């Protein structure tokens, strides 16, 4: 009798633990322990990190799920919403989907202007490898791999154009300058990375508008690109300051 009572008490004591473990096992991918709560942002601010662990998106180069905010998607969303004006000042732009978004809104009548660093203002598909520095040849080779959508290691004329963000802008008449347009030798390194939409929204941060700056390099799926962020701020006063800087260049 006493043995049976002790056995039953032991079973009852273990039951909550068993239930807890079972519930935990039924929730796939749940991390044990509480995660750090995200700090609230001021009104009209949005912050995105391409290596953030709290969210995931599909890597555009290979379709795999990866951690982080899709910075390219955030830019395209803001561009698509433009009604009057989009100003972009960025050191390097090689993502064709951003160019296509700019072309779409331009066709709707939106005023689109782009300023680039002079070393990155020419279409890579127009350049001959023998005219390039070793570093520029390596960059061109990487962009060719990104443009080779069927991965047959042979670029067609259509693939070259579709994969060249600068050539797309030029072909579609998007107003574009580099930092030597005023007749100077340039700034040495025009390192701006900002977008102003409709004189009210500013998007700025650390990321160049490139695959390595936002998603990762072509090749190994483990590549998640440089660690970068974008900050979106809706403020006409701040937008006026960034427009002033844009017009100065």
Question: Can you name each region flagged by the protein language model?
Answer:
Residues 2-13:
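Bacterial N-terminal signal peptides that target proteins for export
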Residues 13-22:
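Bacterial N-terminal signal peptides
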Residues 22-23, 205:
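Hydrophobic alpha-helical membrane context
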Residues 26-27:
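Bacterial signal peptide processing site
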Residues 31-81, 92-249:
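HKD-type phospholipase D/PLD-like phosphodiesterase module
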């Amino acid at each position: 009798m006493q043995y049976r009572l002790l056995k039953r008490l032991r079973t009852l004591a273990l039951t909550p633990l068993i239930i807890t473990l079972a519930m935990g096992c039924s929730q796939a991918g749940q991390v044990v322990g509480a995660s750090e709560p995200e700090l609230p942002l001021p009104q009209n601010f949005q912050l995105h990190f391409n290596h953030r662990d709290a969210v995931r998106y599909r890597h555009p180069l290979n379709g795999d799920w990866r951690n982080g905010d899709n910075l390219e998607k955030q830019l395209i969303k803001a561009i698509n919403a433009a009604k009057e004006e989009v100003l972009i000042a960025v050191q390097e732009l090689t993502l064709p989907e951003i160019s296509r978004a700019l072309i779409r809104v331009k066709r709707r009548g939106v005023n689109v202007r782009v300023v680039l660093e002079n070393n990155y203002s020419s279409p890579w598909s127009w350049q001959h490898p023998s005219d390039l520095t070793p570093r520029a040849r390596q960059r061109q080779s990487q962009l060719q791999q990104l443009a080779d959508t069927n991965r047959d290691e042979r670029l067609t004329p259509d693939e070259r154009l579709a994969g060249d963000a600068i050539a797309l802008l030029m072909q579609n008449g998007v107003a574009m300058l580099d930092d030597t347009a005023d007749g100077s030798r340039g700034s040495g390194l025009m390192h701006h990375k900002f977008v102003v939409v409709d004189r009210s929204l500013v998007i700025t941060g650390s990321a160049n508008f490139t695959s390595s700056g936002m998603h990762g390099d072509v090749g190994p799926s483990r590549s998640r690109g440089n660690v970068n962020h974008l900050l979106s701020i809706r403020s006409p006063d701040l937008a006026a300051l960034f427009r002033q800087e844009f017009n100065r260049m």
